[in-house]
Curated annotation (Swiss-Prot):
Protein name stated in the entry: UPF0306 protein YhbP
Family, as annotated: Belongs to the UPF0306 family.
Gene3D superfamilies membership: Electron Transport, Fmn-binding Protein, Chain A (2.30.110.10)
Annotated HAMAP family: UPF0306
Domain of life per record: Bacteria
């Protein structure tokens, strides 16, 4: 549990996620501002359905991605690598996520793009501020945490 708490605190301070999707052997990555839900261990993003990554995702798809800062020194590197699933939200689920997203990013109120959820199933957090190469791993549903 401590691993997930540590990762969640760090993710709550960041705001841009990179995620990649695959369809029929073709890969594509995208970036977006995100809202992180620590209870669901999920990112919420807005992206238009006409984008290449949304078209490749369809209503639901496997994803992998990263969140990282841009430190100028190796000793300060921190970042997350993850895998999970992306899906477009509908109805009340979408409405609730959009309200929370708009609170974090008020400018998003002007956007009509659909809300998507990236549910994280595996997270590897690298935190060199705790020692070079220090990694923490969280796996959904396994009850295991590795530090």
């Amino acid at each position: 549990m401590e691993t997930l708490i540590t990762i969640s605190r760090w993710l709550a301070k960041q705001h841009v996620v990179t995620w990649c999707v695959q369809q029929e052997g073709e890969l594509w990555c995208a970036n977006a501002f995100y809202l992180f839900d620590a209870q669901k261990v999920a990112f919420y993003i807005l992206t238009e359905e006409k984008t290449r990554h949304a078209q490749m995702s369809g209503p639901q798809a496997a994803v992998a991605g990263t969140v990282n800062g841009q430190p100028k020194t190796v000793a300060l590197i921190r970042g997350v690598q993850f895998k999970g699933e992306i899906r477009r939200l509908e109805g009340e689920e979408s409405d609730l996520a959009r309200k929370a997203y708009n609170r974090r990013f008020p400018v998003a109120r002007m956007l009509s793009a659909p809300v998507w959820e990236i549910r994280l199933d595996e997270i590897k957090f690298t935190d060199n501020t705790l020692g070079f190469g220090k990694k923490m791993i969280w796996l959904r549903g396994s009850g295991t945490e590795q530090a």
